[in-house]
Amino acid sequence: ITSCGLNQGPLRAEGSYPSVIACNLTNGNMPHGSNSIFQISFPNVTHQGEERFLAEISEGTLIGYKYFSFRNVTRIGVMARIETEDNKVQYKGPLRLDERVTEKADRHHQIRRPGMPSEQPVLEIRLTETGDPVGEILLDENAEEWTKFWGNAEIPDGESALYFVYHGTPRIQLRDICF
């Protein structure tokens, strides 16, 4: 699965894209998808009305996009906000619980990502899942409304995947990625 889908090639790293085109979204410890409603928190694609975004992004979450065509890109931005009880999407339908909800975490997919938790929320910018960061985007832990944040990045020209790894205590939501 790629983010560029029917584009016949990599997306141009210009303008902005909805965050929900991510082709990788994991905290390294997630249940496999099903039509059940899970009562555990994990990164997910969701919506409020017509607005689509990634939610429940917590420490160590990996968000990946394949592929972009980079040309003279020196900074990357995101439209993000801190997840609060007021903006968190609450499921209001009937529960269809899956017995896997209560399985131990070590039975789910695990990936190793180097990095240290951060007191200030930060998104590392990477070109590979486990590679060294090429930049970072510092977020404001008080931003409860959609806010655009930018970070400098050293990205060589050419085609590449783009990954973000989140470090921080509060959960965040991500609406757009920007170039």
Predicted regions and their residues:
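Extracytoplasmic
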Residues: 1-179
